[in-house]
């Protein structure tokens, strides 16, 4: 595909995404399923606009690659070491158990035992792209079940290497003498990548950042991700695993957040392209001729994987309320199956339509996951939010609250407790099941649900409430909720939590003026106490704190247009010098006006 064809394909992809995803969101089936349906519509078995599916599918894997890089940035080597038990324990158990059961069933379906083994391994894998996307949408990424799900996915990526090596052995086409030299060279190259990345990446990015040109920094980030993916692909290893390692190596660097901001737009677009490509690969001809076989295989695949994952989650000690989410989010087949089954087909392991049937099963299983998650979400909402008696009441009670608090983590808890202590009527919404269960045991009225859903806000009393306090962990959720409230509940007074200056800029641009930066107030208070401990008069220290807060807020507002540009660094330095000059002038005047005011606690 080249030239005008490539441009036409790009336009078709963008049109399909723009048309299908908002429609899917309106229907409440999620963006992922919208992308899949869009792919079916424009693919060879739909309207037939695009026929070269394999090439596009390979290119669109870059979406998964970028996603794994960002996941790597959110971890560090010490955190990865802490997850070793769940990665090599639960992850290995899931792959082996699921593969064994599924391989046995494929043998009963007249697959050769070699093809059944490959089929079982391929079907045992889950979709990294879909699972991580859904976990983020459902707020699972910070929960115990989300961490366990990520560990299982990471082991599956590691299992790609031996699984691909197993195919020629099963086909009987492996070299008589195993080439240990090639294996040793791959291991050596992998080690060089790790060591080189460990000691070279930070100095290189420090040099690039010194240029002050954001575009160059973005280009360098893309170069790193694509080079790591290409290098791992040349070694015959998982591209996603390579970029994940690159992300982990940079997780503790000072450029972590800038790297994430540079990659995020590309990740979203390419992930959408990946799901559209998967939808295009669905062979409707095979589905039509083997409808009962495919339908049964999809149900069996999802049920077996859910049962296996649920059992492992129980053995691992995951809360009962989180096990169903964990089991369902990993219940589908994954993108790795396309690679493994294609390799097996080239070795003539499959007969007739067997490969096509397996690929259709994988694709349809991916389409069931968003619907399954939606159903489980509703079931959990009714179960967790329902009254003690089995009477008919809404799944979130509208108690005519004055305030709706979104998020009941450490930040949200303090706000909610203060409001309740002052007899304010509040409703708390939280999508971490574990937190909901724990807080309800202590008597807090906390409801489970995703506050970015309009109907949940409406049933929680948003139409009658006076204010909403947004304390989400993820800035994306905060901004989405702000836009939602401004559109559907414009009367609400919005107050929000900002993790840092970038989030504060975004809130100001969205028209939210009442916000609190996560550590700013506590840091100022500790700074005031430090000034007093160094001999400054308590009243003078208090005034210094107030001056600093006021001038820092002014600087924050002045830098709004530049918040996404590296020019902000020089602007911030100028503002800091101005702040110091004003501060010194005011403090000199303050020293002449001190009275006998003393500190009190």
Swiss-Prot record:
Membrane topology: Multi-pass membrane protein
Keyword annotations of the record: Antiport, Cell inner membrane, Cell membrane, Ion transport, Membrane, Potassium, Potassium transport, Transmembrane, Transmembrane helix, Transport
Main location: membrane
Pfam family membership, one: Na_H_Exchanger
Cellular component annotations (GO), alphabetically ordered: plasma membrane
Transmembrane segments: 4-24, 29-49, 55-75, 87-107, 111-131, 152-172, 177-197, 207-227, 230-250, 262-282, 284-304, 324-344, 356-376
Any GO molecular function: glutathione-regulated potassium exporter activity
Residue intervals of the RCK N-terminal domain: 400-519
Domain of life of the native organism: Bacteria
Protein location: Cell inner membrane
SUPFAM superfamilies for the chain: NAD(P)-binding Rossmann-fold domains
GO terms for biological process, alphabetical: proton transmembrane transport
Complex formation: Interacts with the regulatory subunit KefG.
HAMAP family associated with the record: K_H_efflux_KefB
Similarity comment: family membership: Belongs to the monovalent cation:proton antiporter 2 (CPA2) transporter (TC 2.A.37) family. KefB subfamily.
Role according to the record: Pore-forming subunit of a potassium efflux system that confers protection against electrophiles. Catalyzes K(+)/H(+) antiport.
Name of the protein this chain belongs to: Glutathione-regulated potassium-efflux system protein KefB
Organism of derivation: Salmonella typhimurium (strain LT2 / SGSC1412 / ATCC 700720)
Lineage: Bacteria, Pseudomonadati, Pseudomonadota, Gammaproteobacteria, Enterobacterales
């Amino acid at each position: 595909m080249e030239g005008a064809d490539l441009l036409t394909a790009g336009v078709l992809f963008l049109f399909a995404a723009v048309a299908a995803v908002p429609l899917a969101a309106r229907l409440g089936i999620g963006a992922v399923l919208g992308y899949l349906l869009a792919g079916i519509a424009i693919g060879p078995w739909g309207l037939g606009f695009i026929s070269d599916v394999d090439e596009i599918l390979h290119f669109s894997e870059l979406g998964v690659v970028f996603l794994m890089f960002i996941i790597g940035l959110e971890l560090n080597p010490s955190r990865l070491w802490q997850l070793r038990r769940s990665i090599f324990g639960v992850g290995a158990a899931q792959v082996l158990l699921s593969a064994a059961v599924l391989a046995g069933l494929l043998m009963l379906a007249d697959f050769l035992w070699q093809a059944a083994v490959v089929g079982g391994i391929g079907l045992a894998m889950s979709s990294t792209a879909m699972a991580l996307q859904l976990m983020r949408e459902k707020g699972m990424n910070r929960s115990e079940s989300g961490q366990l799900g990520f560990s299982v996915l990471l082991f599956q990526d590691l299992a790609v290497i031996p699984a691909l090596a197993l195919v020629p052995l099963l086909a009987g086409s492996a070299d008589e003498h195993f080439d240990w030299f090639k294996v040793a060279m791959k291991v050596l190259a992998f080690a060089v990548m790790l060591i080189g990345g460990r000691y070279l990446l930070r100095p290189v990015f420090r040099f690039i950042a010194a240029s002050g040109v954001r575009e160059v920094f973005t280009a360098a980030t893309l170069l790193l991700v694509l080079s790591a993916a290409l290098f791992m692909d040349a070694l015959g290893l998982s591209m996603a695993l390579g970029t994940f390692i690159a992300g982990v190596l940079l997780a503790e660097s000072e450029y972590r957040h800038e790297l994430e901001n540079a990659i995020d737009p590309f990740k979203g677009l390419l992930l959408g392209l990946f799901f559209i490509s998967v939808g295009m690969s669905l062979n409707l001809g095979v589905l039509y001729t083997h409808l009962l076989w495919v339908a049964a295989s999809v149900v069996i695949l999802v049920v077996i994987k859910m049962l296996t994952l649920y059992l492992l989650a129980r053995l691992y000690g995951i809360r009962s309320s989180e096990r169903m989410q964990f089991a369902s989010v990993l219940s589908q087949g994954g993108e790795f199956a396309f690679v493994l089954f294609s390799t097996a087909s080239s070795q003539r392991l499959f007969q007739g339509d067997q490969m096509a049937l397996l690929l259709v099963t994988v694709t349809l299983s991916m389409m069931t996951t968003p619907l399954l998650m939606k159903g489980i979400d509703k079931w959990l909402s009714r179960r967790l939010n329902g009254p003690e008696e089995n009477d008919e009441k809404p799944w979130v009670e509208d108690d005519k609250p004055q305030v709706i608090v979104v998020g009941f983590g450490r930040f949200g808890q303090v706000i909610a407790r203060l409001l309740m202590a002052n007899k304010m009527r509040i409703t708390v919404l939280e999508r971490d099941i574990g937190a909901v269960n724990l807080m309800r045991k202590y008597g807090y009225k906390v409801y489970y649900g995703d506050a970015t859903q309009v109907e949940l806000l409406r049933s929680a009393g948003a139409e009658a409430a006076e204010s909403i306090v947004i304390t989400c962990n993820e800035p994306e959720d905060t901004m989405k909720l702000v836009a939602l409230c401004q559109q559907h509940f414009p009367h609400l007074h919005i107050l929000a939590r900002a993790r840092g200056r970038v989030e504060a800029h975004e809130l100001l641009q969205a028209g939210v003026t009442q916000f609190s930066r996560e550590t700013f107030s506590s840091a100022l208070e500790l700074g005031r106490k430090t000034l007093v401990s160094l001999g400054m008069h308590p009243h003078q220290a208090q005034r210094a704190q107030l001056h600093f807060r006021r001038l820092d807020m002014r600087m924050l507002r002045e830098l709004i247009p530049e918040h996404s540009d590296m020019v902000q660094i020089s602007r911030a330095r100028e503002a800091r010098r101005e702040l110091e000059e004003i501060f010194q002038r005011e403090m000199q005047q303050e020293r002449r006006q001190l009275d006998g005011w003393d500190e009190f606690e």
